């Protein structure tokens, strides 16, 4: 009854925040075995407090475009929970950004950061600003205007933002530069920085590498591996590119990539250098890949199956949804399973619908939910914070080894928790309960 009461209250209070509802529903319904066995969580109103952000900050961002016209966007930062450490979570610049999207991402971040073993609370922020087709100067002016409003709410031991969709190293650089001018301090207030001013080696690789490490841990328990296996990866940003890179390093065969306009299937396996050239150097579109590789076929989004994504209709052993939320529907899940998919590891946040997740759990495949499988990114952000605090950078090998260890520990925690609650293949339950218990314990200990 406790979970049902919370969900009803949420629906009544925020009726139009469908992404936030989806994230909360997925998480707290899997907490039922824990909540039924321990009534102290209800006594201390932990769920009520957990789903309500500690602070929501919204602000106007005014900036000048290249035609000297004033443009106005909306910026926000949702500081969700600081029970186990300073707020930590990315900034997203995309037209889809609204309160519901940022709250879902912030809520997910709380549980994800809890799993990392590092002392980080959860937050998320961003703007409805679209960096696509903007000039370098327009992006710089927007970032400076955004930081003019955000700077008073963040700090190295208060709230440490990072990048997300639409916010890469370039944007982080502009944001950091403006923060430094405003406060006259050089401190680790942002992660994802360039290597010459406090960034960490292995940061851009971290989410993708970590996702593959987690998938390998899941498969190892079943006496299997990714070596020699065909893999489908969606997206073509940092997460997708470095998922593909790590898959190639371990001998797997990634055959797909995508962007908002369509997807490519390369029967010979993805040419990583070409993909990096198109997406990182040129900032081009994925269709350019098919123009340069005769082995590749391009499918535009208008030709995708109704209610589905063409990328998940390519037969594969393992799928790595690494683009955006709700990119993998129940139709896609059915298709993946019927084509023999044995492993799904989520590089993106909430890429699978709740109905798709149910199918994966029923099929008992190796399914790594995003808050566990993609926690490598924020883990290395935490390691960047540690390097900034000590003013001592670490080598790529040291950071990668620490990342690999953290992903192993996350898997171990998730797997042991699932076994504790008599559902050993349910890593959704394992991840949510393991993440929740740590945060809840800290919340109860610190009082109301």
From Swiss-Prot:
Its EC number is 1.4.1.4. Gene3D superfamilies: Glutamate Dehydrogenase, chain A, domain 3, Leucine Dehydrogenase, chain A, domain 1, NAD(P)-binding Rossmann-like Domain. NADP(+) binds at residues 207, 238. The record marks 164 as: Important for catalysis. It comes from the Bacteria. Substrate binds at residues 88, 109, 112, 163, 381. Keywords: NADP, Oxidoreductase. One of its GO terms (molecular function) is glutamate dehydrogenase (NADP+) activity. Transmembrane segments: none annotated. The active site is at 124 (proton donor). One of its GO terms (cellular component) is cytosol. Catalyzes the reversible oxidative deamination of glutamate to alpha-ketoglutarate and ammonia. Belongs to the Glu/Leu/Phe/Val dehydrogenases family. Homohexamer. NCBIfam families: PRK09414.1. This is NADP-specific glutamate dehydrogenase. It comes from Helicobacter pylori (strain J99 / ATCC 700824). The gene is gdhA.
